[in-house]
């Protein structure tokens, strides 16, 4: 799964990268410890216009009576996303991009403190995850929510965790956003093994309250 990430890109850079119109209420950057249930940056496309907009990280199905009315759905498995009642309509009709600098994952060994790793693209470019989104309404409450699509881990990721966010390249963005017709299922594949860089980082990030650039600074193994 992907349960923590960081975003250091300025809003202007994101706007230019996606050729998107930015909302006025985007989350502040940089944020070196982005956690579930907070607003994150997303990109959607409608009628030929891309929009950079905030969404709550944590997909809320329409039948939830309240935001915490069931399991916290921060990820959606690519293998079952088109079949699960919570996700299937969003998979067909409401797909988004989720820009990040990288994400954290923990290698867990029984009896030991979880070991945090910082994962980025090996070429230094920003990461862009595939996402799905949903408007949730109950009475006067309204939230726009999202989840990150995941795949099986590639061989490089597998020693740390068995899942990996679905990482999209720029040529895949139009297809995922529905701008280039159908066939998005064809790009739901694990990233190539050489596409990712893995670095050990401080256990400070084990706390969801930790902040600061030191969280992504590599340490000796």
Labelled PLM ranges:
Residues 1-221:
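Short linear sequence motif anchored by a di-proline
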């Amino acid at each position: 799964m992907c349960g923590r990430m960081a975003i250091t890109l300025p809003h202007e850079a994101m706007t230019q990268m996606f050729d998107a119109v930015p909302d006025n209420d985007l989350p502040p950057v940089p944020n070196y410890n982005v956690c579930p249930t907070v607003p994150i940056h997303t990109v959607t496309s409608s009628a030929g216009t891309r929009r950079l907009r905030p969404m709550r990280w944590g997909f809320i199905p329409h039948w939830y009576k309240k935001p915490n009315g069931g399991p916290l759905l921060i990820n959606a498995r690519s293998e079952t996303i088109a079949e699960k009642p919570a996700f299937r309509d969003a998979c067909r009709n409401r797909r988004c991009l989720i820009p990040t600098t990288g994400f954290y994952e923990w290698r867990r060994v029984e009896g030991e403190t979880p070991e945090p790793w910082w994962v980025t693209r090996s070429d230094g470019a920003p990461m862009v995850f595939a996402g799905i989104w949903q408007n949730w309404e109950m009475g006067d409450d309204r939230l726009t929510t999202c989840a990150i699509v995941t795949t099986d881990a590639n061989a490089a990721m597998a020693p740390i965790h068995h899942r990996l966010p679905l990482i999209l390249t720029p040529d895949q963005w139009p297809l995922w956003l529905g701008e280039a017709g159908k066939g998005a299922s064809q790009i739901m594949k694990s990233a190539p093994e050489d596409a990712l860089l893995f670095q050990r980082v401080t256990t400070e990030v084990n706390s969801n309250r930790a902040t600061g650039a030191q969280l992504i600074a590599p340490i000796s193994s």
